[in-house]
């Protein structure tokens, strides 16, 4: 029952932050917002991987990580119409699909790692590493994205 309450707290926090993350992205920019959110989430999730002595400390860090990821979700949806003007529908569908698959793979992966190693440490660090990888990926393409946004050659759908 306690694990269910903790899960609900994380899901609620992430969901609540989506519109606020979109508003923040409108104010400071979607890319900048996402870079901050990836940093915060990665640090919090990596910290939980150090086997904290208190379940409440772990919960607090997970909630902050989920707040960050929820805000990042809002930032992603702020970026979609800027980057993919003619494919907004398909892109939002793909983003939603990726989120659903990612949520499934995360829980399945963490469970498999726990079963094979006896704890979640490696899985949490791998998950934090994905945030770092996303940060570097976004940082690496941001200049190219900014110079090609709105270009019909880049954003037009092709079959």
What are these model-predicted stretches?
Residues 39-53:
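C-terminal ends and interior cores of transmembrane alpha-helices
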Residues 122-140:
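Symmetry-related core transmembrane helices of the 12-TM Major Facilitator Superfamily/SLC fold
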Residues 26-38:
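Cytoplasmic membrane-interface "Motif A"-like loop-to-helix N-cap segments
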Residues 24-25, 109-118:
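Interfacial helix-cap and linker-helix signal at transmembrane-aqueous boundaries
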Residues 17-29:
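Helix-to-loop junctions at the C-terminal end of transmembrane segments
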Residues 11-19, 100-104:
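Residue-level signature of mid-helix packing/kink "hotspots" within the transmembrane helices
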Residues 71-84:
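Intracellular juxtamembrane helix-capping segments at the cytosolic ends
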Residues 1-12, 90, 122-125:
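Loop-to-transmembrane helix entry
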């Amino acid at each position: 029952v306690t694990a269910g309450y903790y899960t609900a707290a994380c899901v609620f926090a992430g969901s609540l932050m989506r519109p606020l993350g979109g508003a923040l992205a409108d104010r400071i920019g979607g890319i900048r917002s996402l870079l901050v959110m990836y940093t915060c989430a990665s640090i919090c999730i990596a910290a939980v991987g150090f086997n904290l002595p208190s379940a409440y400390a772990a919960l607090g860090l997970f909630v902050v990580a989920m707040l960050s990821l929820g805000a990042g979700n809002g930032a992603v949806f702020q970026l979609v119409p800027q980057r993919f003007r003619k494919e907004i529908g398909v892109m939002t569908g793909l983003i939603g699909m990726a989120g659903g698959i990612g949520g499934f793979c995360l829980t399945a992966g963490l469970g498999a790692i726990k079963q094979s190693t006896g704890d979640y440490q490696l899985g949490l660090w791998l998950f934090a590493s994905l945030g770092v990888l996303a940060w570097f990926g976004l940082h690496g393409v941001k200049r190219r994205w900014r110079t090609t946004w709105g270009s019909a050659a880049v954003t037009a759908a092709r079959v």
